[in-house]
Amino acid sequence: MSRVCQVTGKRPMVGNNRSHAKNATRRRFLPNLQNHRFWLENEKRFVQLRISTKGMRIIDKKGIEVVIAELRARGEKV
């Protein structure tokens, strides 16, 4: 499963670890992804999304029905 938020589109970034001596070694910064089930009242079923914590805040703000409608509008299967 890819490490991409279904709501925000956040994906891993690349950067450097920096030691005390300022040596640089490559590393990945991973998004804080969570598998979360949401209840859709109008469909009477649960939907499981792999979303970042920022995506959870967006769902709290807009509502799950609006976010699911946006996902379906851009062609994502939910």
UniProtKB/Swiss-Prot annotation:
<dbReference type="InterPro" id="IPR034704">
    <property type="entry name" value="Ribosomal_bL28/bL31-like_sf"/>
</dbReference>
<protein>
    <recommendedName>
        <fullName>Large ribosomal subunit protein bL28</fullName>
    </recommendedName>
</protein>
<dbReference type="InterPro" id="IPR001383">
    <property type="entry name" value="Ribosomal_bL28_bact-type"/>
</dbReference>
<comment type="similarity">
    <text>Belongs to the bacterial ribosomal protein bL28 family.</text>
</comment>
<dbReference type="GO" id="GO:0022625">
    <property type="term" value="C:cytosolic large ribosomal subunit"/>
</dbReference>
<dbReference type="GO" id="GO:0006412">
    <property type="term" value="P:translation"/>
</dbReference>
<dbReference type="InterPro" id="IPR026569">
    <property type="entry name" value="Ribosomal_bL28"/>
</dbReference>
<keyword id="KW-0687">Ribonucleoprotein</keyword>
<dbReference type="GO" id="GO:0003735">
    <property type="term" value="F:structural constituent of ribosome"/>
</dbReference>
<dbReference type="InterPro" id="IPR037147">
    <property type="entry name" value="Ribosomal_bL28_sf"/>
</dbReference>
<dbReference type="Pfam" id="PF00830">
    <property type="entry name" value="Ribosomal_L28"/>
</dbReference>
<keyword id="KW-0689">Ribosomal protein</keyword>
<feature type="region of interest" description="Disordered">
    <location>
        <begin position="1"/>
        <end position="21"/>
    </location>
</feature>
